Amino acid sequence: MFQQRSCGATCKSVVIAVLWVMTSGGLAAQSVTDVGSASSVSANPTLHKAAVSRDPFVDPLDAPAAMHENIARLPLMSIASAGKRLVAVGMRGLIAVSDDGGQSWSQVPAPVSSDLLALSFPNASQGWAVGHDGVVLHTADGGKTWIKQFDGRDAAIKLAANYQARIDAGDKTLQPYLDQLTLNYKAGPSLPLLSVWFKDSEHGMAVGSFGMAISTDDAGKTWRPNLERIDNPQFLHLNSVGEVAGDVYIAGEQGAIFKLDQGSGKFKLTQTDYAGSFFGITGNQDVLIAYGLRGTLYRSADHGASWGRVESPLHGTVTSAVYVSPGKAFVFVTTAGEAVRADSSLHDFRSLGPARPTVNTGVQVTTGGALIISGLGGPTAMALQ
């Protein structure tokens, strides 16, 4: 029942890592501070750890991120706004900030060298980053300094203890979740957290591979397991969590979309007719868009109750999307380097320029109305035409 399976092409970080290795020529000939080795092959925890240090081995959870003089083309996995500041995270613990709308970037220290995959800033000062090795980082000053709050080592002990205590107190329904949790960390702490979302400066949630879900009500000082809150008996990979127009959604593999029921506090499954992975959901008060592999887009006009496929001109896997309210437009970016604008009806798609010769991983709108796209070739600014 609890057979572990590979993350495979269902995890965005794996898709991106494979493309990075293919385009960079791999790790073998790269130095430890080179961009090529910085990918660290997210798909393979062994290579992920081996690339961090040659001799002696230092676990990425124990090694601060290497500092670089020039980060303009280092690989980034996600980007977010912290007030007027932009913050991006990437391979091998890279954290970069920009205070001029993405025109220039500077690296800030990170306490780990694990790959960082996602960000959430509920306000201009408080922010969280998550990634490989189950790591959760926190900043209280808008991304200038970071501390580690949680990691896969903590998860293997503290999350299991939480479930075991509740089972011992009589809640036997939690046993399958404890079994899955134990299986997830049987091989060590490398299981990634793929996405994080904070409602405010106290309440947040992170999700990841094999149904992993954790939450906090005290700004990340303590984390508890939340596998049982999600209608996910197969423990599908959970690729993203976030809020759209007041509702909270989780996008997963095998066409699974979960919506938070405010009354019960549980995420209920809406199964689409899509067999692939969704990597995120964006939208507004009127429409939701779920995006996934090979340019896949699904649309809902009833707050996620039902979904239908949209004809899409996109070729690459859609890694990120944003709704730009002033222009009433959606912007999608892909692993094929595409950046495309679509009207709110999703009938008119227009390219924002030639495809970048890199993998796009994220997109953010600045306070000035420009687009900043993160990717494996670094960040780039683009006008919203």
Across the structure, where does each feature detected by a protein language model lie?
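Bacterial N-terminal signal peptides
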Residues: 12-24
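A periodicity- and composition-biased signal for non-globular, repetitive helical segments
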Residues: 9-10, 18, 36, 281
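Bacterial N-terminal signal peptides that target proteins for export
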Residues: 2-15
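Residue-identity detector for glycine
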Residues: 8, 25-26
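Residue-level hotspots at or immediately adjacent to binding/recognition sites across diverse folds
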Residues: 2, 29-385
